[in-house]
Structure formats: C-alpha cells, structure tokens
C-alpha cells in the first residue's frame, strides 16, 4: 500500500468516473479547491465501455417520458433530473466542444461514436477548472475527527 502526500483541498472526490468527474466540476464551480483520487490508471475507465464503446450520454426525451419509462418508481430520480436535466447534460458537452447526435429512441451519443471523446472533454473541463486528479490513488480508509474527514 502506498501512502500519498495529499495536498490541501476543500473537496476530495473519490473516483474519476462520470459521477465523480461531474461532482468535482460542480464543486469547482462553487469555488472549491478540488482533488480527485482515482484508483485506476486513467480517468473515466468504465466510460470507455458504455454504450458499446460509444457512450450513451443521455436521452433527449422530455422528462415525463423518461420518468414514465422507468419500470419501478421513477420518482427517486426527480430531484437529480430537475436539478441537472438531460438538456443541461447536452448543453454541458456542446458548450465544452463535444459534438453530439441523437439517434433512434432519442439516445444521445458523441458525434464521433467514441467514448474516448467524452472522457477527453471531461478531463479538459476539469483541468480548465483547476481540478487536480491523482491516478493510481486507491482510497482504502477515511480518518474521522470530530465528525469531519481529516485524512
């Protein structure tokens, strides 16, 4: 096990998957100094295989159609989708230089059909925001003191 010297950060995100990278981005927009710790050798590793390697970004249907298509109680998704909806996802990628397309079933993919372009866009946005990412940095334990994570 390797002990990393971790710089001070207001926010530390564990994992550089899609959710981790977007959480880091959101925190950076709030002015936080953000550090991502990723155990793998590259960010977004699992994104490479989504959508058969093409990365299905979202669905372009209206939110009510999306909720209705969820077999079991779509209400659990209300708060997250009303906060950052599918249109916001598309706008985020377009604004950051990723061309997208909508296919059958309103599925949204990168125009290139390469998930690597999605990852590249996310990584570039994080760098632009000053987010630091440490690869090969597996988190195995959290140290708490007075109800706060201190290490």
Task: Describe these PLM feature segments.
Residues 108-109, 149-151:
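Generic recognition of long tandem-repeat/solenoid scaffolds
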Residues 135-148:
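A conserved short coil-to-beta-strand element within the FAD-binding core of flavoproteins
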Residues 23-24, 46, 144:
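Short glycine-/acidic-enriched loop or helix-start segments at secondary-structure transitions
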């Amino acid at each position: 096990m390797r002990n990393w010297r971790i710089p001070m950060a207001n926010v530390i995100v564990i994992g550089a998957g899609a959710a981790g990278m977007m959480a880091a981005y959101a925190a950076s927009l709030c002015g936080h100094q953000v550090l991502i710790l990723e155990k793998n050798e590259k960010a977004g590793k699992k994104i490479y295989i989504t959508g058969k390697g093409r990365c299905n970004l979202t669905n372009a249907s209206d939110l009510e159609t999306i909720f209705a298509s969820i077999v079991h109680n779509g209400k659990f998704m209300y708060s997250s989708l009303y906060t950052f909806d599918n249109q916001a996802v598309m706008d985020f990628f377009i604004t950051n230089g990723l061309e997208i397309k909508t296919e059958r079933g309103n599925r949204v993919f990168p125009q290139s059909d390469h998930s690597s372009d999605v990852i590249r866009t996310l990584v570039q946005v994080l760098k632009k925001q000053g987010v630091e990412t440490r690869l090969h940095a597996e988190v195995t334990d959290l140290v708490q003191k007075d109800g706060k994570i201190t290490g």
